[in-house]
Amino acid sequence: MKERKNSAAAFEQAKQIIPGGVNSPVRALKSVGTTPLFVRDAKGPYIYDIDDNKFIDFSMSWGVFILGHNNDKVSKAASDAIFHGSSFGIPTLAETTLAEKVRESFPSMERLRFVNSGTEATMSAIRVARGFTGRDILVKFEGCYHGHADHLLVSAGSAVAKLNNASSAGVPAGFTQYTVVLPYNDIEALEKYFAENGDKVAALIIEPVACNMGVVPPTREFIEATRKVTQEHGAILIFDEVITGFRLSYGGAQKRFGITPDMTTVGKIVGGGFPAAAFGGRADIMSVLAPEGPVYQAGTLSGNPVAMAAGYETLKQLGEPGVYELLEERSNRFLSRLEKIVEGKGIQVNHVGTMFTMFFNDQPVRNFQDTKKSDQERFARYFRNMLDRGIYVSPSQFEGNFISLCHTDEILDYVLKSIEESIE
């Protein structure tokens, strides 16, 4: 058992001024029956807390650090940039050079704009889609998270489309009246809704691989159907690649699946560890944005030069030959061995590329309703057991874990041994 007295004291101090003691709910570790560790430093695959404990990190700031924490070249790029100024509210060349780098890897983003978070990116993309189509209805899928904008905090309570069912207090009914939620991986429900209402739909937004109910891959037929029905009815297909962008390949999930959306959002990796995200798409769609068009969007710190520099250096390294092949090879080796370890033990390993979730569930997990059948108490015990062994896995049954270039085979071997000891 690792001592975390300093972290416990820091948490009590934080709770006196920050609601719940944290700036994002999952960080409180409430669902896994413990209190948060407070981080002092991070390097490569490791994080170090204020009690001088060292942990192998499998959250990697929720997938941001695909190169590992505190990459030397990325840190230097950021420090060099900040020497010249951290924000100007005036254009810089750094914005254009990173935008060109993003478009190089995501050709579907013919025009793009930077914002500060994934929530801003999805919120802005939806506004653009509505402005372009002149329609109101947004279709999303149960269990897919697209940020905490009011009209996106909606989920269905059954395997049918529902309107106006907010999943957070403080969201007025009127904010969600144009959001429709369909069951994930259900082609029949998707086709039925579009057959009856498709001409009213402004956009369909989807995580091309669901990551925020745990990693739940789409069936090939389902993800292809999202492209088919939107094209048939003139609706905008938005791929929310805030997590999968630059994670599943240099061109994200859309390159991996060979499907071209009308609009895309990227985040996390694109800022190299700094607050940054982007939304973009076809040039004709993006032309409705002010100052060229009537759709307004703005941000004081959008495209700040420090994030742009860190993002550019990150993408530069990811674009080097063999990077994704190495990531895939290392991940496949780890995950194939993990599947053998958990076989017959009531655990499902869902994975795509370097992302995976261990569902403590007897049955395959294909949608949000399946995820809710998972044993959260068993997961919580597993999380605490892993923490005691010096491994920080993502602290929720309904989140993904992420492998980075810094997770060597030796480290992954130790993680496998620890998993075998930690599951019940």
Where are each of the predicted segments found?
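Conserved N-terminal phosphate-binding loop of PLP-dependent enzymes in the Aspartate aminotransferase
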Residues: M1-E424
